[in-house]
Amino acid sequence: MFEQEAWQPSAPIKTLFTRAKIIREIRKFFTERGLLEVETPVLSEFGVTDVHLSTFNTEFIAPIGENSKTLWLMTSPEYHMKRLLAAGSGAIFQICRVFRNEEAGSRHNPEFTMLEWYRPHFDMYRLINEVDDLLQQILDCEPAESFSYQFVFQQYVGLDPLSAPRAELVAKAREHHFMCDENEERDTLLEFLFSTVVEPQIGQTRPAVIYHFPASQAALAQISSEDHRVAERFEFYFKGLELANGFNELTDANEQLIRFERDNRQREKMGLPQRAIDKRLLAALEAGMPNCAGVALGVDRLLMAALNANRIEEVMAFGVNNA
């Protein structure tokens, strides 16, 4: 009667044992270093303003006499974890499910597992070293190679991403079959060229960390005090996968508000719905979040790298197509 239903798990049971073992190793790594494991909400009154992130929402049916309200599934535990930091939690980590309303593919599932941690009084470079330590322990790999965004972009694209005229970026993007006009957003061109030309060249045999992304791509990172053209942001790549994205975290509430408002203006320009700004995060920053560095790492992609898997559902009990 039901024999046509695809009920079997996406990943072999043997893989799920390996997954559990690696998650235990991750917890041990941080516990031994004195970090507090925390849990934060999956649902929030606030989504995210980031134009690159699409969120799921649901309707909370309030008791009679109270107003129902829209709640958002979290794309990251970042905002809640920063509120804990402002409250004096000290160094913290979390392994949790997060949700992004994006297409499913070989490297993407709309529901996935994220490892996120924050280190008060660490700078970007010290946190890069800790990410590298974790990867070496979990993947038994060589230490990561380290390159600035500007260096690898010049190396493989042949243009300086911080100073090249827009017309040159447009011409180079068209060489790689990107359909764009002369007024294409500069960041769109940079992101296309980086993902299409640079990413396939890095982190193939050992992890690679790229740091100092353009200031226009700072997100929630501080701008470098040494070069205002770049942000104190880094990403790790290995075996064709983006594994981790980290920042020297922005602590200025007013600057964060400016960036959120800029996101919403860009959303309006792109025909996307604007999002309510998380004022609780801004209040926490204003109250005094300590200087810190933080990073988010995709656990499923880490497992893909560990097991040489080609598709993300190969390391999950159930992918979106048979959930």
Swiss-Prot record:
Residues binding substrate, per UniProt: 76-78, 118, 249
Domain of life: Bacteria
GO biological processes: lysyl-tRNA aminoacylation
Pfam families: tRNA-synt_2 (PF00152)
Keywords: ATP-binding, Ligase, Nucleotide-binding
SUPFAM superfamilies linked: Class II aaRS and biotin synthetases (SSF55681)
Reaction equation(s) it catalyzes: D-beta-lysine + L-lysyl-[protein] + ATP = N(6)-((3R)-3,6-diaminohexanoyl)-L-lysyl-[protein] + AMP + diphosphate + H(+)
EC number: 6.3.2.-
MF-aspect GO terms: acid-ammonia (or amide) ligase activity; ATP binding; lysine-tRNA ligase activity; tRNA binding
Nucleotide-binding as UniProt keyword: yes
The keyword Repeat appears for this protein: no
Binding site for ATP: 100-102, 109, 242-243, 298
GO cellular component, one term: cytosol
Role, per record: With EpmB is involved in the beta-lysylation step of the post-translational modification of translation elongation factor P (EF-P). Catalyzes the ATP-dependent activation of (R)-beta-lysine produced by EpmB, forming a lysyl-adenylate, from which the beta-lysyl moiety is then transferred to the epsilon-amino group of a conserved specific lysine residue in EF-P.
Similarity field: Belongs to the class-II aminoacyl-tRNA synthetase family. EpmA subfamily.
Subunit structure: Homodimer.
Name listed for the protein in its UniProt record: Elongation factor P--(R)-beta-lysine ligase
